[in-house]
Swiss-Prot record:
Compartment(s): Nucleus, Nucleoplasm; Cytoplasm
Biased composition (Gly residues): 92-115
Tissue: Initially localizes to the animal half of the late blastula embryo, then to the neural crest and neural tube from late neurula stage through to larval stages, and finally in the neural tissues and developing pronephros of tailbud stages. Expressed in a range of adult tissues including kidney, brain, lung, liver, heart, muslce, stomach, small and large intestine, and skin.
Annotated ranges, domain RRM: 5-83
Official protein name in the record: Cold-inducible RNA-binding protein A
Record note on quaternary structure: Interacts with prmt1. Interacts with elavl1/elrA (via RRM3). Associates with ribosomes.
Species name: Xenopus laevis
Post-translational modifications: Methylated on arginine residues within RGG motifs. Methylation by prmt1 promotes cytoplasmic accumulation.
MF GO annotations: enzyme binding; mRNA 3'-UTR binding; mRNA binding; ribosome binding; RNA binding; small ribosomal subunit rRNA binding; translation repressor activity
Compositionally skewed regions (Basic and acidic residues) per UniProt: 157-166
UniProt induction comment: By cold stress in adult brain. Cold-induction may be adult-specific since cold-induction is not observed during embryonic development. Induced by tcf7l1/tcf-3.
Keywords of the record: Cytoplasm, Developmental protein, Nucleus, RNA-binding, Stress response
Gene Ontology CC: one annotated term: nucleoplasm
């Protein structure tokens, strides 16, 4: 229930920190939490964050008022965290739950996708092993090629063909 007042803030300037974000949103109501998501290794902002309001109506007001506005020189996107935004950004979530590699590969666009895709197919077919392993390997090679050739949301197609290998 506490997530109802939580907003996803995308498109942040990499210099924007929690204090800047709080200043931009505090005029819409009492804020219980502000988080700018940072890269685990470099500790730099990843360009998005979350603002949680104590009151759901305040969060909705802030979302309507701030979506598309400029913060620290960058136009931001404001969406409700979880429900509606989760469905729209399902590609990221689906990829990360399918295997952490797909999430990172998806961000790489192209080479990264194929690298992660092929290793997942190879590991899987190797697990079923035996003499059919070589046939599965070539099958995944074809699938990987078509996966790499199609761009944009094609990982779902790969999952469909992936299911037929099992």
């Amino acid at each position: 229930m506490s997530d109802e007042g939580k907003l996803f803030i995308g498109g942040l300037n990499f210099e924007t920190n929690e204090d800047c974000l709080e200043q931009a949103f505090t005029k819409y109501g009492r804020i219980s939490e502000v988080v700018v998501v940072k890269d685990r290794e470099t500790k730099r902002s990843r360009g998005f964050g979350f603002v949680t309001f104590e009151n759901v109506d305040d969060a909705k007001d802030a979302m309507m008022a701030m979506n598309g506005k400029s913060v620290d020189g960058r136009q931001i996107r404001v969406d409700q965290a979880g429900k509606s935004s989760g469905e729209r950004r399902g590609g990221y979530r689906g990829g990360s739950s399918g295997g952490r590699g797909f999430f990172r590969g998806g961000r790489g666009r192209g080479g990264g996708d194929r690298g992660y895709g092929s290793s997942r197919f190879d590991n899987r077919s190797g697990g079923y092993g035996g003499s059919s392993g070589s046939r599965d390997y070539y099958g995944s090679g074809r699938s990987q090629g078509s996966y790499g050739d199609r761009s944009g949301g094609s990982y779902r197609d790969s999952y469909d063909s992936y299911a037929t290998h099992e």
